[in-house]
Amino acid sequence: MARELRNAKISFVSYVDKAANQTEFFFTKSAEPPSFEKKVRLFTKSEQDEQKLVYGIVYEPDVPDAHGDFMTAEEIEKAAHGFLAEAREIDINHSFEGGTGVVVESYVAPDDFMIGSKRITKGSWVLVTRASDEVWEQIKAGIITGYSMAGTADVYEEEPVEKAGFFSVFKQMLADKTGKETEEMRKEDMKESFEHALYPLLKRLERIEKNTDTEEKPEQTGDDERLKKLVEDMLAPLIERIEALEKARGASKQTADDTGGNTEQVKKSIWSGLL
């Protein structure tokens, strides 16, 4: 289940070594108060040793992390501004001992752009620090691999949205017809019922295909057209019920003038899925 983080307040930044950064993104949070810690992998560093600049993307807007948590562009901007104004301490592995580096840049990308080979998405929070000599040597050696951001945030859980796939729609149709609860119906049962209903059509199609010779016979075209019309006629009630269910669920926002285009699209989908 996706969780949105709001009103995030970053309290400190740590350089973390390889052992502490086994996963590229890491969060630990509690519901009350909701706190978090995130490992941010460094994506580039300055080529000139005397600069000792290291870069990391703290957050990208609306991009869930490994635990499904995300922040909007607005919330990212608030967190970035708050961090720069109130918390600029940097240590190593949460030792709370300063002198390891300083924040030299902290900004929210105004547009998409590139830093080295890394593409920065608009709204992303980029943090740049200048490392101490000791930390810089560890970064070059691959010992220190990222930042660790920690702080608090309000957590809002999003309810999962069930995608209205074909089998879920068909399940509802069968439930309406049989009076059974939809939860009691299995996908295998729906598939069996659907195949049973279309079995006569599929057998007729099989016979036509078996009778196809190298030279096409004139009457075969007529058989194909009749079969196509028969399939469309039999599927028409099914399509109408699907559209009715979609409208009832708010899945279809198109006007009545668009119904013809919708119907054709559903027909193609059902036909291609069967044959």
Swiss-Prot record:
InterPro entries in the record: XkdF
Species of the source: Bacillus subtilis (strain 168)
Stretch list, region Disordered: 247-275
Membership in a protein family: To B.subtilis YqbD.
Pfam families: Peptidase_S78_2
Protein's UniProt name: Phage-like element PBSX protein XkdF
